[in-house]
Regions:
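Small-residue-rich helix-loop
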Residues: 266-268
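Acidic/His- and Gly-rich active-site-bordering loop/insert found
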Residues: 1-30, 51-56
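Active-site metal-binding loops of divalent metal-dependent hydrolases
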Residues: 3, 68, 94, 177, ...
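Short helix-loop-beta-strand segments that form the rim/entrance of peptidase-like active sites
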Residues: 49-68
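Structural motif
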Residues: 25-26, 60-61, 87-90
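Midchain, well-structured core segments that form catalytic/ion-binding scaffolds
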Residues: 75-258
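Active-site alpha-helical elements of protease catalytic centers
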Residues: 31-46
Length: 269
């Protein structure tokens, strides 16, 4: 199992994210289910076996990972430095009934430097905290004509005049990046809102690409990535992080592809 967690994020209502407070028999906090709580349960399970007098015929070990959420670099280091791997193992990082497979994961970054021209100039575009979280909030700022605000009309999007332009904010529903269909992606919603503006040049092309080829889709249909199998269902695409720095827009995404498909087939697409 693993002890690292996804970013705490905003919107905690019961407790602070790392308080570990117990209320009505429940522990609240980031990682209580994924995966600190299950790791503690595994320790107690071994203790229960020992107290019951169970004598295993094979050695039992616990491995505590610290980098599962962002690539398992800790395990690569462990193996390359002589760490022992199990003959048989399982991880208490799932649900009941037992999960015996996991989709492949392909993380990447799409970056494009924008040589901006025309009356609309992007100065800020940001949202999300990690590739494996569907973001609940994203915002952009543009230098543009005063009437730009009237050109955007979209649900869960707020446009506010600022000096020399506008600020556009989009709301979503945050969920884990492995199940983006259960949420609403604020970055995709923001791109669709900005695509209503008469953007020109590379800025217009880039925003149209994000809005029309990704947008609120979660299976990569418009990117030509849609694929599925009977065992694990469809490929999913999560747009997790957006950042605009030094005239470059970067989008960090996470693809989960069906268990029966090979990386070599998915990556070229």
């Amino acid at each position: 199992g693993h002890l690292d967690v996804v970013p705490a994020g905003d919107g905690w209502t019961e407790t602070e994210p790392f308080s570990g407070e117990i209320k009505n028999g429940r522990i609240y906090g980031r990682g209580t289910m994924d995966d600190k709580g299950p790791m503690v349960a595994a320790i107690y399970a071994l203790a229960a076996l020992k107290d019951a007098g169970f004598a295993p015929s094979k050695r039992i070990r616990l491995l505590f990972g610290t980098n599962e959420e962002t690539g398992c670099g800790d395990m690569s280091w462990y193996v390359s430095h002589g760490g022992e791997l199990p003959v048989y193992g399982f991880t208490p990082d799932g649900e009941y009934p037992i999960i015996n497979g996991e989709k492949g994961i392909l993380n990447g970054t799409y970056s494009r430097k924008l040589h901006q021209t025309g009356d609309y100039r992007l100065t800020k575009f940001e949202g999300g905290a990690a590739s494996n979280i569907s973001p609940a909030y994203a915002a952009a700022e543009l230098q543009c004509p005063a009437d730009a605000a009237s050109k955007i009309s979209a649900d869960k999007v707020t446009v506010t005049p600022i000096e020399g332009g506008i600020r556009v904010e989009a709301e979503g529903i945050a969920v884990h990046g492995s199940t983006p269909e259960q949420g609403e992606n604020a970055i995709g919603r923001l791109a669709q809102a900005l695509n209503q503006l008469p953007l020109t040049g590379e800025l217009g092309d880039c925003m149209a690409f994000v809005a029309e080829r990704i947008g609120m889709e979660v299976h990569g249909e418009s990117l030509g990535l849609a694929m599925r199998d009977e065992l694990s269902g469809p490929l999913t695409l999560n747009l997790g992080v957006a950042k605009f720095e030094q005239e470059t827009l970067s989008l960090v995404f996470s693809v989960r592809y069906p268990v029966t498909l090979q990386y070599e087939r998915v990556y070229p697409r």
